[in-house]
Structures are given as C-alpha cells and as structure tokens.
Amino acid sequence: MNLKEMGKNAKQAATILAQLSQQQKNTALQIIAEQLELQSNKILVENAKDIQLAKENGLSDAIIDRLLLTKERINSIANDVRHIISLPDPIGQIIDGGILESGTKLERVRVPLGVIGVIYEARPNVTVDVATLCLKTGNAVILRGGKETSYSNKILVTVIQDALEQTGLPKNAVQAITDPDRNFVLELLKLDKYVDMIIPRGGAGLHEFCKQNSTIPVIIGGVGVCHVFVEESAEQDKALAVIDNAKTQRPSTCNTLETLLVQESIATEFLPKLVAHLKHKNVKYHADPTALSILEKQNAEVSIVQEQQLRQEWGSLDLNVVIVKDIQQAIAHITEYGTQHSEAILTSSPRLAHQFVSLVDAAAVYVNASTRFTDGGQFGLGAEVAVSTQKLHARGPMGLEALTTYKWVCSGDYTVRQ
C-alpha cells in the first residue's frame, strides 16, 4: 500500500470536487444512499464476519454494539445521507465582506479544506458519515478504520466508490487504508504534503498518539466523560427520566452520562428513587463512600469508586455516583475529571443554571436536558464527522461548516495600492 500515491490521488480528486456544483454533489449522495439500501444484504454479510471475529476475540458487548449493522441501521445511515442532501451547501457562501476605501470589493468566501484524514475505531457507520459529509463540502477523504471493522469498511467504501463512478466523479475522492499495520497510521500523520486535517475518532490513547506524532493539524475530541449534576431544587421525577436517557439509551456513545453528581442535601431522598427507576436497566454503580452507604441499603449492585474510574469513559452501563456539597463543588469536580465534551445541570434555579453554563468548560452545556443531544443530527447539522472538544477551528459536533475554511477574494478594476 503506497500512502504517498493515495495522498496524491486524493489531492487530485479534491481539485475536481472543489469545482462541483451543489446539484452534482447531491446527485452523487443520492446514489450513495440508494446503493447502501440496495446492497444492504452484501453489507450485512461482511459485517457478520466482523461480528464473528469480535466475539472470538472476546470483545465487550459495548464494542460489539458499535460494530453491529442491521437492516434498520443501514436504512438509518442512508437516511442520514439524504438529510445531508437537504442541507444548504456551505461552499461558495459569502461569509462577510464589503467595499474598501480603494473601491475594491472584498469578500470572505467559504471553501473546502482539501484532503481530510480520518482515523477511527469500531464504528462502521462513521465510514459513511464521514465520506458523505466530506463529499458535500468538496473535500476528499482518506479513511482508516479500526481492524475490528475491516470487512464492513471495505464493502462500504466499495459501495461509495462505485456510486461515485456512476456519476462520473473520481473514486479516489473516498479512499481507505485497509492494512491494519499501525505504521500506516503513523505514515498518514506525516503526509502533510497532501493531507490538510487529521480527525481521530476513538479513545484517549488514539487522540494522544495523533497529537504526539502528527505534522498535520489534528482535531481533538470524542472522548466523553460526561456529567449530570442534580441540584437540590431539581424536579426529581423529571430528573430521573433525564438520567435514564443519558445513561441507558445507548451506553456506548461518547455523549453518554458517566458520572452522576448529586447534591448532598437531597442524596438520601434521591438515590433510592434512582435505584428504583433503573432497577431493570442492569446499571452497575461505582460510588463514593457517602453514596455507597445509601446505595447498599437499596440492594443495588455497587462498589467503591476508584479515582481512575472518575476519568474513565465506561461505554457501558457502569455509572459513577459522587455526592457534592454544592454547585461550586460540582463544577470543581467537572473541571478536574471532565473531558470538555457534554455537561448537564438539573435545576429549577435560573441563577444556578446561568452560573453552571458560565463556568463549566465544555463543548456542549445542558440545562434540564440529556447529554445525549450532543450529536450532529440532533443539532440539525446532519451526520457529524466528529465531536470536537478543543476550542480552535471547530467545537462540538462537526457538521458541514466545520469541514470548510475560507479565502479572501478581492475584486478591483486594475486597482493598485496607494
């Protein structure tokens, strides 16, 4: 596998994509959506191979859930592509501008980034999400999925490339590194002659590896140690529903609740209600000493929480429970252990809600809502390429605009600077 050749081909494809009209790009996306559904049986056969290997290798249920494709999930992915078609094309958008003192017309115009490298783990849906978002924004993409999704990724990329060729577009607009050798990841991270941005989607180890080794700008994000703080004025029955949703709806996602913070003044009243509410959800609790004594009396499956577990993205039905004295202690805990992803407060106090929003440093902050909303589709951005937890270039779910940059376009009448 020649990565330099792959990079060169991607750069050439990006030049073609940058010139396409919105209609040309949308036509290609429509065919991709149709082919995903038409080829779903082939996709499921290949996905079953990944699932079988995952089980043989003893991977967790959480990882297998990320790997799994079903007819329903493929249809959902295809519908996400159709939603991207319906979104306005940001390319060519005039962000701002005006007439300069010299009479020259100046405009700031949105343009594609060029070539994007995306490194991700056990999520085959990311293959389609990323490829179609990049195509919509006129970017070429080099994908490197995890070895756990090898069969699924190969068939998905083949379906996408075939659809591109049907519309006369270069199939090299979407390419994949299929060799599991990690040296190819390292080589991709050094391919700054051709690649304009690297987006890692995976655990903290992957992000750190990319930060340490890349000569290309890296978007960091996706690691979600998310908190919900139940403040003493919260409506408790409604709070239980939010916690249930944030923890159990799909535990393997990065916007799932990992640590519940409960104000001390309501802990003895609220925690028994929590256990009763979640009793059929197979939640395992990891609690501080105060919470432990309360939860044990409810016959909950509970153990003492270890310090390192407070920094852990469980990706499962494990839940940390910590008692805090007040909002200041809750914010301090989030500052120490959070990953700047998604944080929530449940409260009836507008003043405390404002304080929480102002002081918590995260890409998304919620008042009386589940952290599960941190998602490109939920935010109306279409499928997301990643959730950025950094502050430069993009923050939060990265939709179409996050895959663009801008250039200054200056138009004069043979104007010279005086």
From Swiss-Prot:
GO BP term (any one): L-proline biosynthetic process
One GO term describing the cellular component: cytoplasm
InterPro entries named among the record's database cross-references: Ald_DH/histidinol_DH, Ald_DH_C, Ald_DH_N, Aldehyde_DH_dom, G-glutamylP_reductase_CS, Glu-5-SA_DH, GPR_dom
GO molecular function, one term: NADP binding
Keywords: Amino-acid biosynthesis, Cytoplasm, NADP, Oxidoreductase, Proline biosynthesis
One Pfam family of this chain: Aldedh
SUPFAM superfamilies in the cross-refs: ALDH-like
Main location: cytoplasm
Pathway where this protein functions: Amino-acid biosynthesis; L-proline biosynthesis; L-glutamate 5-semialdehyde from L-glutamate: step 2/2
Keyword Cytoplasm among record annotations: yes
EC number: 1.2.1.41
Catalytic EC class: oxidoreductase
Subcellular localization, as worded in the UniProt entry: Cytoplasm
Catalyzed reactions: L-glutamate 5-semialdehyde + phosphate + NADP(+) = L-glutamyl 5-phosphate + NADPH + H(+)
Entry keyword annotation includes Oxidoreductase: yes
Protein task: Catalyzes the NADPH-dependent reduction of L-glutamate 5-phosphate into L-glutamate 5-semialdehyde and phosphate. The product spontaneously undergoes cyclization to form 1-pyrroline-5-carboxylate.
Family assignment from sequence similarity: Belongs to the gamma-glutamyl phosphate reductase family.
Alphabetical list of HAMAP family matching this protein: ProA
The name this protein goes by in its record: Gamma-glutamyl phosphate reductase
Gene, per the UniProt record: proA
